[in-house]
Structures are given as structure tokens and as C-alpha cells.
Amino acid sequence: MKFFVDTADVAAIAELNDLGMVDGVTTNPSLILKSGRDITEVTKEICELVDGPVSAEVVATQADAMIAEGRKLAEIAENITVKLPLTWDGLKACKTLTDEGKMVNVTLCFSANQALLAAKAGASFISPFIGRLDDLNVDGMELIEDIRTIYDNYGYETEILAASIRTVNHMKEAALIGADVATAPPGVIKQMANHVLTDKGLAAFLSDWEKTGQKIL
């Protein structure tokens, strides 16, 4: 499973990228606001840092305007993925932009029916939102499983990009189900290294080593 980082924080992306943990990046208007930076400037910097797809989101709501914004965003770098909302206008824009050879990430997906439409419109990625479904006491992972089954049944090449990831368990479940990609905040990715028994075992080893009175360096 590929890891995308869900942030516009360049320093956080760089830290994970140095460890080989970054296969791509996703941003949205909220993350751009949080960064406090100009969208073109920060997106270009991210694209120069990361080789993989970098999602940049349109803010228009009508198809023609979405297409125009998507074309503008795609000029930033070759690895830009235009991010579009899963609306009827978004699907129209998706079809046009993918026909032009641009990568498209269709976002705010909350049903398998929506995911099927996005695949038929030629989306490069579909982004089902796990955490927001969980907020409504709906199993977000069941949606990932349904989309995986549908895409496999018919050979769709659209990649499933599990989004709205909030916990390390979300990451594990997405990998088990077969999501192609999971995008998560830097903190969640780093938390995947943590386990109480690892900490306990390390403490015991270090305590015993100290008792030997030896040094390695």
C-alpha cells in the first residue's frame, strides 16, 4: 500500500520523505489555510520535494470553472493531480481533464455508487472518507471493501485512496482490505512505529546492558 501524506506542511513532508515513507501528497483548501502560504507557492515546493502525485484541489463548483482551475493547477508541475469533488459537475470535469491526460483525484466519496461513477469518468484516484463516515456510526472500512470488490469485478484502474484517516488502525484496516493508497496526517504515520511492548522491551534491554558495564563506542 502506498503512503500519501495529508498535509501542506513542507517540513513534515520532508522528514517522512527522507525515510522513504512518502509516495505522494494530498492537500485541500483547509490544509492550505493551515499552512498560511500561497497555494501555488507551497504546492510547487511540495512537487519539487516529492516525486509522486501531489493533489491540489479546485474550489469552483461548476464544471467549466473546475476545468479551468484544474488546468491552471496542472501547470504548477508534472506530478500535480487535480482534486475534484464528487458531484455531477465534478464528474464532468473529471472526464474532460482525464481525456486531456491529466491525473484526477475525485474526493469526498461516501458511497460505492459514487466510486463507480468516478471510475467510469476516468478518475486516477477515488478518495473515500473513512473518518467522516465513522463519525456517523457508519463503518468506513466497509465502503473501502465494497469499492475494492466492484473495481476488481470489472477491472477498473482507478486507485482507491483511503482518506480521512485518523488512527493507526485505519491504516492497518485499509492495508488489509486492499486500498491502493492511504493518505494520512504525518502524526498518524509516525504513530505506526509505536507499541507499548516495544517500549517495554527496549527499556529492559537497556537496563540489562547498563549492568554489563560495557560500551559499544
UniProtKB/Swiss-Prot annotation:
The family database entries (Gene3D superfamilies) matched by this protein are listed as: Aldolase class I
According to UniProt, the name of this protein is: Probable transaldolase
Q: Which UniProt keywords apply?
A: Cytoplasm, Pentose shunt, Schiff base, Transferase
Gene Ontology CC terms: cytoplasm
**Catalysed reaction equations from the record:** D-sedoheptulose 7-phosphate + D-glyceraldehyde 3-phosphate = D-erythrose 4-phosphate + beta-D-fructose 6-phosphate
Q: Which family does it belong to?
A: Belongs to the transaldolase family. Type 3B subfamily.
Major localization listed first in the record, in broad terms: cytoplasm
> Where in the sequence is the active site?
83
> Any idea what job this protein has?
Transaldolase is important for the balance of metabolites in the pentose-phosphate pathway.
Annotated EC: 2.2.1.2
SUPFAM superfamilies reported in the protein's UniProt record:
Aldolase
Annotated Gene Ontology MF terms? aldehyde-lyase activity; transaldolase activity
Q: Cite the annotated pathway.
A: Carbohydrate degradation; pentose phosphate pathway; D-glyceraldehyde 3-phosphate and beta-D-fructose 6-phosphate from D-ribose 5-phosphate and D-xylulose 5-phosphate (non-oxidative stage): step 2/3
GO annotation, biological process: carbohydrate metabolic process; pentose-phosphate shunt
